[in-house]
Amino acid sequence: MATNTVGIDKEVEVNRKENLRDHRLYWIGRRTQDVILSSLALVVLSPVMLATAIAIVVDDPSAGPVFSQERIGRNGKPFKFYKFRSMCPNAEAKLDDLLDQNEMDGPVFKIKDDPRITRVGKFIRKTSLDELSQLWNILKGDMSIVGPRPALPREVEQYGDYEKQRLYVTPGLSCYWQIAPHRNDLSFEEWMDLDVKYVKERSFWVDWKIIFKTFKVCLLGRGE
């Protein structure tokens, strides 16, 4: 896998270093928190994850329960992103046929009632169970509990300097956008505004506020 960074030029990189110079204690505490929480969650939720994997394979045995995909992390560094499979195995190949139905402005593709989503996929998306495999990404250090959702390389290639600010921090399992009411009705610009807001406001208090609201979203089945 390529190790070169994507989407961060030298000028933006200098600004990033200045912006984060006073946050070393926060980063150390945040990483410690991520390791502890992800380790505990992997143990406690392992029966749920096993049941999810079995349900996916029973519903569609043509592929495995987890898929990996290259995403862009902090400082534009690519990493292998894991997610419980909620779509048919050839979902990427079918994307070109659906691009004209895209309901999201900007470089992100989203449509309601995506025909590539499987029966089990609809349930695990609504309950956010499809995200549980990313606990491994968090334990590895590719992701954090809280942070902007990791973007695809093709999306980052279209970022301007404003959108690149979301790459200053480690991508996360949940964020302001993830807990926003009717999040899929938000425009791409509104989504980026929420991510930049997090970059500027991030703190332990903000992180825990998002974590608690994420539990509420999952319990109420308000996931995608």
Residue ranges of predicted features:
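Short, glycine-rich, amphipathic interfacial segments at transmembrane boundaries or analogous
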Residues: 2-9, 66-115, 174-193
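Active-site alpha-helix of zinc metalloproteases
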Residues: 26, 30, 117, 126
